[in-house]
Regions:
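Short hydrophobic/Thr-rich beta-strand motif most characteristic of the beta2 strand and flanking loop
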Residues: 25-35, 43, 91
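Positively charged, low-complexity/disordered segments
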Residues: 115-119
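Conserved acidic segment of CheY-like receiver
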Residues: 2-13, 17, 33, 52
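Switch/coupling loops of ABC transporter nucleotide-binding domains
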Residues: 2, 29, 77
Length: 119
């Protein structure tokens, strides 16, 4: 069973992503959520997340810093950034951190099939 963490400060985004993933991978995934970068980093490390769907702009600690903190302790964890920011700078930094993918919001149900190939 894959442990998936969805980190986004927007409750509707967290719920939508969780719903899409749960419908597509019902018996293959356990889902946890986090509403900010600090909680995402802590949850990912303590819970042992296998995969994180991470927003970039979140209060307190942004998603890039949260991913960096997680990957320092759990380098086997996979990170996919899901963000509204299409700036090359963000995508470049995300890939430099070792992100598996960089998806732009809104995420459509058809894009969730990419999650299966990312893990």
């Amino acid at each position: 069973m894959i442990r998936l963490l969805i980190a986004d400060d927007e409750a509707l985004e967290r719920e939508t992503l969780a719903d899409i993933v749960a419908r597509r991978f019902e018996h293959e995934v356990t889902i946890e959520t986090a509403e900010n970068g600090r909680k995402a980093a802590d949850t990912a490390v303590l819970w042992g997340a296998d995969l994180i769907l991470m927003d970039i702009e979140m209060p307190g600690m942004n998603g890039l810093d949260a991913a960096r903190a997680v990957l320092e302790q759990r380098p086997e964890c996979k990170v996919i950034f899901v963000t509204a920011y299409s700036l090359f700078q963000y995508a470049h930094e995300a890939m430099h951190l070792g992100a598996c993918d960089y998806l732009l919001k809104p995420v459509k149900d058809r894009k969730s099939t990419r999650l299966n190939s990312s893990h």
